[in-house]
Amino acid sequence: MELKKLEKFVDEIKEKIRRLKEQYYAGKTEVESELRKVQKELKTKVKEFFKDLTPWDRVQLARHPKRPHTKDYIERIFNNFQELHGDRFCGDDPSIVAGIGYFYGKPVAVIGHEKGRDTKERMKRNFGMPNPEGYKKANRVMKLAEKFRFPVVTFVDTPGAFPGIEAEEHNQSKAIADSIYTMAYLKVPTVSVIIGEGGSGGALALAVADRVFMLQNSVYSVISPEGCAAILWKDQKAVEKAAEALKLTAQDLLQLGVIDGIIPEPYGAAHIDPLSTARVVKYCLRKTLNELTKRDISSLLEERIQKYSSMGVFEIAPTIEKYD
């Protein structure tokens, strides 16, 4: 079953479930058995479809137009979120949303990439590709959180930092480097969740956290499969091979020790049930922040520095001399 056919099937079944629930709550308890049967059918079909996904399949799911974005998670997880604008240097970049909200009654700083939904909003938000002003804004909010001792939660969903001429003129590389440096040494607990695409340094700028989680069908890589295929194979048709070679899935990155955990997506994909996905993310954040906020900040900072300093470290095997 193709993804579009599956989504059509899911929509039809969900509508059927909605009607059966209305009847059940109206007092027609005889529909309970049929309701359970339909719900089971939905779970079985979806589970069967998503059980053997290739890395390229997961890339396509990570980019799905209906996949929940940062603003969706903010709306469903945090209370009284107040967005902050501007980098206090040049301007504001809508491709990064940043502000202060309440999580179970306690203030937290929330920062994330935002791609937008329709064409107009996507153009406004530059398709989730931040300019230097976006990273400077994120940097400002991180330092604000540190000043008032708020934990920092980030949501990563970007194909990468914007590679335009103006972005380079405004020192894109330094803006990313400053964000990475600030996040590495923040004296507050930090949690990052990769919710869609995690593209190169543009993603890393918001992902140097104490704990990094990935949604089941998100991806995180130094380059897109298309870019990798063009460079290594000189062929756009090699995207599937490139996706496999890049080890960009949550499963691969957990095994490699790059991330700390995988957040399951209900019904196999976040866009099929965004509300349930937000609930799972909320539970993960609550559990993680409860753990981190109890820790001494000096030991947490030391652990964070050690974690990222040790990535990519390797040993060269000693030379074995040959004897006649």
Feature-to-residue mapping (PLM):
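Short, motif-level signal for alpha-helix interfacial/capping segments enriched in acidic residues
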Residues: 31-34, 134-136, 228
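Short active-site-adjacent helix-start/loop capping segments
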Residues: 68-70, 118-120, 162-164
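Terminal peptide-recognition signature
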Residues: 13, 54, 110, 157, ...
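Conserved catalytic cores of soluble enzyme domains
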Residues: 156-286, 290, 294
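Short coil/turn segments at secondary-structure boundaries
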Residues: 65-69, 126-129, 167
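Intrinsically disordered, low-complexity segments enriched in small/flexible residues
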Residues: 1-107, 275, 279-324
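Glycine-rich beta-alpha loop segments
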Residues: 51, 90-92, 98, 104-155, ...
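Short hinge/gating elements
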Residues: 59-62, 123-127, 268-271
